């Protein structure tokens, strides 16, 4: 570790532990009773130790006590380190709360994430895939193409903090580099902090957002009070110097405006070259932060669905069409892709993206998928295949409708293994079988588990 998040509190006890295994979020697990100094009344109690790895002997300071478990932070490694321990690449690791696994070898991170998915599938649904696919791996650094960065001005010190929240805290820690952020964006952080420090209205800036497309970069400044003309001009000159688009957002998303709109609309772009499609998006639109993993993910989804020319596909939670447009390429002009998304703005974005790529076989509808949608015409047309890419809450409300779609193949893309496992159990009840699954390292060095799963309808045999 490069740094420790906080100085040790003298009143909190320290003990020596033998670390046994890893928790789902990457903390070492140990038990009281493995050392003679342990309190007798705590023998057998579980301890979760931040930064500790299996097989290590560590000194740890207790940070939180509960009836059945305790939490601790490693303060010293007392013997040989685990073979899976590596040096964190970021100087802010241990203070910044963005990454939690930089001390773990990348292969072990992948292994842990697959174990998490496997455990959830077994616990919640009692199933395992017939085949585990090779994980989709990420670059180990410079992989994030967007970030929201907090801003806080300390008037007594006349100092502006630009950074991320500390681990389990609302307090910002100042950063001058970010090893997982796109290198050009990361290298710009000191210059950006100096710019914000020089503004008269710096106390009224809540955060900034950086987003990078294939060809453009945007800087969004969220401010709670109007910025004066001099400040806006300074921001404008900075953006012109960097070749960035500049956006100001004084209130909610509807207040977003681009400065110097004559230079173009509020758009950035990215391409999925394997499908010859190009997407336009706004700085506030949801896009996958990891371009490398996203392209591999979309390719794998299309391969798993084994689409044929002329087939019909339903894409639920379609967003701006990240899956829909490649799916439309796969089914060809005689096929059809129907994308459904709650946000009317994103539906319009997806429609525009389909038009710009001449994909007339893709159509989009706005619908809150947590509500009854059975009366809509698109829901009663029948489909050969279904793709579901829900938020963390999963797609439980949709599961009851799945038999009506008639899909032979379902690809479920998940950012939460618990809700994937829950929904998988319902799909099995509806006669689907989990054929293949893989983890995707969308957020490397963090505990977040992204995954993809293929379900196929079991063929009924008529006597």
UniProtKB/Swiss-Prot annotation:
S-adenosyl-L-methionine binds at residues 288, 317, 322, 341, 368, 389. GO terms for biological process: rRNA base methylation. Belongs to the class I-like SAM-binding methyltransferase superfamily. RNA M5U methyltransferase family. RlmD subfamily. NCBIfam families: PRK13168.1 (NF009639), rumA (TIGR00479). The keyword S-adenosyl-L-methionine applies. This is 23S rRNA (uracil(1939)-C(5))-methyltransferase RlmD. It catalyses: uridine(1939) in 23S rRNA + S-adenosyl-L-methionine = 5-methyluridine(1939) in 23S rRNA + S-adenosyl-L-homocysteine + H(+). [4Fe-4S] cluster binds at residues 90, 96, 99, 178. One of its GO terms (molecular function) is iron ion binding. Catalyzes the formation of 5-methyl-uridine at position 1939 (m5U1939) in 23S rRNA. The active site is at 415 (nucleophile). It comes from Acinetobacter baumannii (strain ACICU). Its EC number is 2.1.1.190. Residues 6-76 form the TRAM domain. The keyword Protein transport does not apply. Keywords: 4Fe-4S, Iron, Iron-sulfur, Metal-binding, Methyltransferase, rRNA processing, S-adenosyl-L-methionine, Transferase.
């Amino acid at each position: 570790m490069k740094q420790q998040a906080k100085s040790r509190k003298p009143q909190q006890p320290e003990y020596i532990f033998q670390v046994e295994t890893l928790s789902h979020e990457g903390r070492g697990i140990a038990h009281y009773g493995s050392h003679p100094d342990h309190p007798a009344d705590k023998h057998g109690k579980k301890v979760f130790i931040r930064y500790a790895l299996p097989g290590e002997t560590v000194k740890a300071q207790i940070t939180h006590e509960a009836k059945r478990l305790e939490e601790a932070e490693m303060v010293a490694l007392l013997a040989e380190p685990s073979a899976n321990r590596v040096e964190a690449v970021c100087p802010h690791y241990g203070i910044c709360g963005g990454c939690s696994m930089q001390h773990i070898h990348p292969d072990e991170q992948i292994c842990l994430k697959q174990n998490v998915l496997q455990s959830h599938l077994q616990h919640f649904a009692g199933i395992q895939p017939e085949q585990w696919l090779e994980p989709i791996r990420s670059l180990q650094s410079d992989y994030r193409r967007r970030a929201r960065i907090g801003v806080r001005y300390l008037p007594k010190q006349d100092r502006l903090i630009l950074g991320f929240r500390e681990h389990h805290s609302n307090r910002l820690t100042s950063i001058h580099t970010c090893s997982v952020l796109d290198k050009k964006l990361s290298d710009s952080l000191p210059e950006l902090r100096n710019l914000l420090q020089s503004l008269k209205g710096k106390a009224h800036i809540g955060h900034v957002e950086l987003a990078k497309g294939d060809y453009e970069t945007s800087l969004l400044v969220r401010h709670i009070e109007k910025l004066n003309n001099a400040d806006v001009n300074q921001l404008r000159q900075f953006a012109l110097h960097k070749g960035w688009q500049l956006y100001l957002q004084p209130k909610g998303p509807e207040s977003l405006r681009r400065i110097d709109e004559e230079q173009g609309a509020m758009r950035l772009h990215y391409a999925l070259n394997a499908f010859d499609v190009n997407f336009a998006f706004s700085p506030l639109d949801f896009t996958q932060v990891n371009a490398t993993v996203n392209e591999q993910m979309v390719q794998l989804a299309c391969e798993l669905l084994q689409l044929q020319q002329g087939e019909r596909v339903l894409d639920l939670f379609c967003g701006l069409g990240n899956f829909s447009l490649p799916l439309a390429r796969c089914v060809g002009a005689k096929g059809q892709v129907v994308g459904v998304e709650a946000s009317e703005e994103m539906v319009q974005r997806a429609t525009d993206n389909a038009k710009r790529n001449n994909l007339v076989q893709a159509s989009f509808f706005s619908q809150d998928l947590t509500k009854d949608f059975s009366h809509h015409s698109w829901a009663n047309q029948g489909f050969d295949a279904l793709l579901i890419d829900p938020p963390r809450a999963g797609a439980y409300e949709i599961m009851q409708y799945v038999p009506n779609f008639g899909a032979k193949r379902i690809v479920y893309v998940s950012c939460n293994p618990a809700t994937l496992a829950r929904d998988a159990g319902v799909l099995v009840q509806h006669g689907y079988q989990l054929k293949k699954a893989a983890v995707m390292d969308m957020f490397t060095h963090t505990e977040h588990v992204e995954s993809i799963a293929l379900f196929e309808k079991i063929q009924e045999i008529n006597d």
